[in-house]
Swiss-Prot record:
Species the sequence originates in: Crotalus durissus cumanensis
Localization of this protein: Secreted
Lineage: Eukaryota, Metazoa, Chordata, Craniata, Vertebrata
Family recorded in the similarity comment: Belongs to the crotamine-myotoxin family.
Protein name (record): Crotamine-IV-2
Listed Pfam families: Myotoxins (PF00819)
Length: 42
C-alpha cells in the first residue's frame, strides 16, 4: 500500500494504484483524508 494524494476533492493514487472505499478494505486506509485507501490493481 502506498499513499495517495488529494486532487480535485478526491483521493487519487500514485503510480499504478487505485483508490477504493474503506469498506472494501477495512483498516488499510492510507490517504490524507482517511476516506479511501490505495490498493494495487488486480
Amino acid at each position: 500500500y502506498k499513499r495517495c494524494h488529494i486532487k480535485g476533492g478526491h483521493c487519487f493514487p500514485k503510480e499504478k494504484l487505485i483508490c477504493i472505499p474503506p469498506s472494501s478494505d477495512i483498516g488499510k486506509m492510507d490517504c490524507p483524508w482517511k476516506r479511501k485507501c490505495c490498493k494495487k490493481r488486480s
